[in-house]
């Protein structure tokens, strides 16, 4: 029986998965196979050619996917995220690293079967960085892809490990094997900054104070921010993040000089965000009550990242700067969601 051609999206029921699947469906060029450990929301499932519920650690599941589908590209979004990973670090490592290894193996097998390199799109994270102290962070300025890679969290370490695994599978896979048996995938990773969404209620992620602040204000609730007012890290909106993945996917391989790229759109302090929120929702109470442990993690992340390589290689250009993020995306949508004025 002929296999059905599909683009695989793992973590399909997450926020980025939802947005990516909608965009892939709009493009009309792809049949999407959605995979998640939970049942995929009906609205998203309707946009997929097929949906599967299962665990990326289940090698039998991976084998079944390969037996039924010809997978032309992989968007591997499934992960245990940063805050949760600190509570269950061993389990996070299993999912984030071994799960990724299972998907890389799938991509290698499909590369052999199809006779061409299967694209593997991987969302990495600013958590891959680790600056030793606040003074160094402030002096470092915009950090390139190859600096300060000493993460202090399990999630960051997992993401950095997977970047290296992807580079190996792309450039050095089975390098001592006979040439006819060797073959590399087309691995492409984006190191995302903090992501801000108008549509999903924040889930306690390390950079979620930005989204939490906006969603609380739109509901008229006071918000105690868990970081210092002067805390600065880079951010971008979720639509810009999804567009970055799609743009990188379409980039000609000969244009790419790296397997890992920084992206970012704006780099406000927590105080800048609070003032912007209070301008939109006058009278809302925003205070600062830093959590020392989460603050220490954020202080290890750069104030900004150098995106020049992404701009030069594949034309990365975010739509939303800080003002446009608020005026065109965040405020209209959170007001609609909560009935705020």
Protein language model annotation of sequence segments:
Residues 56-95:
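NAD(P)H-binding glycine-rich loop region in Rossmannoid oxidoreductase-like domains
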Residues 7-27:
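N-terminal Rossmann NAD(P)H-binding glycine-rich loop of SDR-like oxidoreductase domains
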